[in-house]
Amino acid sequence: MVTEKTLERINELYHKSKAEGLTDAELAEQKQLRADYVKAFRENLRGQLESIKIKNPDGSLIDVKARHDEKMKRLAEEQAEKGN
């Protein structure tokens, strides 16, 4: 989880890198903090996308993930049929 303190440290290291440069330890810390931030961002985005519901023309609701899974299954079946 990325906290406000983590974001402050990321920004602090960024500004220091522009002003005077970073030590090897600080570069490693910056790299790790950025990786953690990107991971948390992606997990959050995925969670938001998976919670979206799509309303079908018939009025029924379906999860985006379920719709995607159905589409991938259908495409795989079509490709398998073409391969035979």
Curated annotation (Swiss-Prot):
Species of the source: Lachnospira eligens (strain ATCC 27750 / DSM 3376 / VPI C15-48 / C15-B4) (Eubacterium eligens)
Superkingdom assignment: Bacteria
Matches recorded under SUPFAM superfamilies: YnzC-like (SSF158221)
Name the record gives this protein: UPF0291 protein EUBELI_00985
One Gene Ontology term, aspect cellular component: cytoplasm
Main subcellular location: cytoplasm
Subcellular location: Cytoplasm
Gene3D superfamilies per the UniProt record, alphabetical: Helix hairpin bin (1.10.287.540)
Pfam families: DUF896
InterPro entries named in the record: DUF896 (IPR009242)
Keywords: Cytoplasm
UniProt family annotation: Belongs to the UPF0291 family.
